Amino acid sequence: MEPIHNPPPQTCSYSRPSTTYTSFKDASCGTKVTRIIIALFLIVISCGLILCAYTFRDLLDADYSAQEGPQQATKLLQQLDKVLTGPPLPIWDNEHLFQFSCLMQNKHRRVLPIDICNPLTKFNFLEYICNCLMTKQSVNVNETDMCELFCPPTCTPENYRRLLCTSSVFPFVMWHDPSADTQEAMLTKMDQTMSSGRVGNSHWVLVIVDIEHRCVTFFDSFYNYIASPQQMREQLEGLAASLGAIYPKEGGSDSDQEELLSPFQVRIGSTVKVQSPGEFTCGAWCCQFLAWYLENPDFDLEEKVPTNPSERRALLADFISTTEQAMSRYSSLSWPTTD
């Protein structure tokens, strides 16, 4: 009997697959395509992360240039030379607007300084102006207690009450950014603009309520930045009707109630663009308009402002230079007194 030889048990051996790295030049066509796609994908992701690191305001303020033909580029440079002659004009913000209104109050006495602690926008200016004029009316007839009187933080209630009693011209400034479509969004945009230190798309416009002349005047240095003149007139006519009820006509017949409560007149003060492109001078133009109004409420803006851009710029530059030093006395933002 022959011995049985059992075969040795088979064992499974697992070997680690070897990875061979090949250069792009020696790689197969499919590998090359795969590597190119991966590289492009990583580049796109990297660019997206870089763009996310920028704020929206940084993108708006970035400089972009387009290649124009020689003739178009020459015409553009000629237009810019007409406008941007001389050093850049300073930017007047809410503090400058307040200081200038204090200067006008000191000169004309009938002007109430601008309250910059309550930001006005196109969403709340109608209600705010009505409340301010109603407060003046109640103060005049001693219906408002000193404790109930709201006054700016840099003015005492007693002084604010006296200023209200002696004022008949009420200037209000509105801040606007076209990208904001609600009051909350507008205030958020305002905070972002102040924090960034950039003007961006922000803009100041002016509303003047004159009780003696029973008139509401609107001024926009860009003419139609917030809305068209007709749209602004429609909004202001509602305000004018409310003011007519708050301040009835003096000397009218008691029997003619409609005549007594006739609305204030509405005037659109800007029929042309007076602010040049590339300049941030809306605040200074609001102050210049207010100064002209206080000299003559019936003045014609087109007669005051030159049509030539360089002459118009020189006019505003002269106004700023002759006014800034006098305004500096109110740099502490304290309200003027009636003493």
Swiss-Prot record:
InterPro entries documented for this protein: Papain-like_cys_pep_sf, Peptidase_C48_C
EC number, as in UniProt: 3.4.22.-
GO molecular function, one term: deNEDDylase activity
UniProt membrane topology term: Single-pass membrane protein
UniProt xrefs under Pfam families: Peptidase_C48
Entry's Gene Ontology cellular component terms: extracellular region; host cell; membrane
Active site positions: H203, D220, C282
Protein name: Deubiquitinase and deneddylase Dub2
